[in-house]
Regions:
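Hydrophobic "anchor" residues
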Residues: 48, 121, 271, 298, ...
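Glycine-rich flavin
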Residues: 2-4, 20-27, 32-171, 198, ...
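N-terminal Rossmann-fold NAD(P) dinucleotide-binding loop
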Residues: 15, 183-184
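FAD-site-proximal beta/loop scaffold in flavoenzymes
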Residues: 155-170, 257-331
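Beta1/beta-strand and adjacent pyrophosphate-binding region of the FAD-binding site
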Residues: 1-12, 170-180
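Gly/Ala-rich phosphate-binding loop of Rossmann-like dinucleotide-binding domains
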Residues: 19, 23, 187, 191-192
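Flexible, glycine-rich terminal cap/loop adjacent to redox cofactors
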Residues: 7-14, 23-35, 40, 47, ...
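Short hydrophobic core segments
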Residues: 7-9, 113, 132-143, 176-177, ...
Length: 459
């Protein structure tokens, strides 16, 4: 029976990075994965959706390039080729991870893991063959899966996993249940390609967990792009009606029905640890997620958990940071990654990127704050790109002048938020972040304008 110092269950961003980090520390490591290396992120999440959005962005820019002197008379979107490109990118990245495992001498065990005892894992392959392994420590990184609420008829709706399997034609229309990150990115993709899109959100605005202005601005932009948006709308049932699927919901105390060729259920994801533990083995749970302490320890010694299966924030980069931190703590090393500064991005058009506190969150916590803002009507790169309403906001402590948060809504926002995260992690003040010269012309120039507005308000 093979013995390892560490067995990692799950080869997503948290699991594979943790395994590689442990291997760099000369540990004998195995990774168990029943599907493709890279997990949801590389195969059914982050990367596939961004690849689709890249294709739809090209289509949109070509179709709407007349303002810049580009005219296209015969342009079409081939869905078979679009999804083939998506698969090609995912497969390249997944194969790359397997190559990294091989180079690092990490054993990649394909199959379903079952924790039979502390320090014991059984791996069952697709043909039903089982092998038992022992280890010093187990790291659970099994991620999450799409949620399906108990709504009558919801079996007629697809999850994001199912939608990403692909379709050989562009849907005439699609109804998206959920106005969060997943729903908005798919709404952007299909709207860009000319599909009739409807978004139904149960809260009072899109992106309800983010700054209020972001959700309100996004709704206006989507409506301008032809997307129908319903907020404060509660889905009652879903039913098949001929060739279409009808979604019945209440909105402003009125009964409404919208139909589409397809329906996507995008109301979030739940931690996945189904069937992970053998009878007689169980860890403490925090509702559906595995409960861990600040060292990622579960209630069973030598069993750890990181990423979506245990974290409150379900993001690939959070899982990666936690995986590396867990390995460092496990082997007596220091880890100084700031887990309280978590950037988050939405790849709609224009992009949205946030980090830290919003004004409302700061006030709710009793923190005195000032907010600086710049609407990017005068930003040259924004005018050239013609992406619509864009802005940047910064939140700072009213007394110490320390930066506490930022909200960006503009082209390439996802590529700029990392620098802001660095400022927050280092507790920089507005004045310190203003010291840097920013290039011209650039989208980043708007940061200086927003920060100057904030500095003026701080006095």
């Amino acid at each position: 029976m093979a013995h390892y110092e560490l067995i990692v269950i799950g080869a997503g961003p948290g699991g594979y990075e943790a395994a590689l980090h442990a291997a760099k520390l000369s540990k004998k490591v195995a990774v168990v994965e029943k599907r493709e290396a890279g997990g949801t992120c590389l195969n059914r999440g982050c990367i596939p959706t961004k690849t689709l959005l890249h294709s739809s962005q090209i289509f949109h820019d070509a179709k709407h390039g007349a303002h810049a002197g580009i005219h296209t008379d015969d342009i079409r979107a081939d869905m078979t080729e679009i999804f083939a490109y998506k698969r090609e990118i995912s497969q390249k990245l997944s194969s790359g991870i397997e190559s990294l495992f091989k180079t690092a001498k990490i054993d990649f065990l394909r199959g379903t893991a079952l924790i039979t005892a502390p320090g014991a894992v059984r791996v069952t392959d697709a043909e039903g063959g089982a092998n038992d392994y022992t280890c010093d420590d187990i790291l659970i990184a099994t991620g999450s899966v799409p949620s399906r609420p108990p709504i009558p008829g919801l079996e007629f709706a697809m999850t994001s996993d199912e939608l990403l399997e692909g379709c050989d034609h562009l849907y005439r229309s699609i109804v998206i249940i959920g106005g969060g990150v997943i729903g908005i990115e798919f709404a952007t993709f299909y709207a860009d390609l000319g599909c009739e899109v409807t978004v139904i959100e149960g809260m009072d605005r899109l992106l309800p967990n983010m700054d209020k202005e972001l959700g309100q601005s996004l709704a206006l932009i989507l409506k301008k792009q032809g997307v129908k948006v319903f907020t404060n709308a509660m889905v009652q049932s879903v039913e098949k009606t001929g060739e279409d699927i009808a979604v019945n919901f209440t909105c402003k105390e009125k009964s409404e029905t919208v139909s589409g060729e397809a329906v996507l259920c995008a109301i979030g994801r739940r931690p996945y640890c189904d069937g992970l533990f053998a009878d007689g083995i169980s860890v403490e749970m925090n509702r559906r997620s595995i409960a861990v302490n600040e060292r990622y320890e579960t209630s069973i010694p030598h069993i750890y958990a990181i990423g979506d299966v245990s974290a409150k924030i379900q993001l690939a980069h959070v899982a990666t940071a936690q995986g590396i931190a867990c390995v460092d703590l496990l082997y007596g090393r220091e880890n100084h990654t700031s887990m309280s500064v978590v950037p988050s991005c939405i790849y709609c058009r224009p992009e949205i990127a946030v980090v830290g506190l919003t004004e409302a969150e700061a006030k709710e916590a009793g923190i005195p704050v000032k907010v600086g803002k710049h609407v990017m009507f005068d930003n040259a790169k924004t005018l050239i790109a013609d992406p619509g309403r864009c802005f940047m906001k910064f939140v700072a402590h009213a007394e110490t002048r320390e930066l506490l948060g930022a909200q960006l809504m503009c082209k390439h926002a996802s590529d700029m938020i990392g620098g802001v995260s660095q400022a927050l992690a280092n507790h920089m003040t507005v004045d310190q972040f203003l010291l840097a010269m920013r290039p011209h012309p650039s989208f980043e120039e708007a940061m200086t304008a927003a920060l100057e507005d904030l500095a003026q308000k701080l006095g």
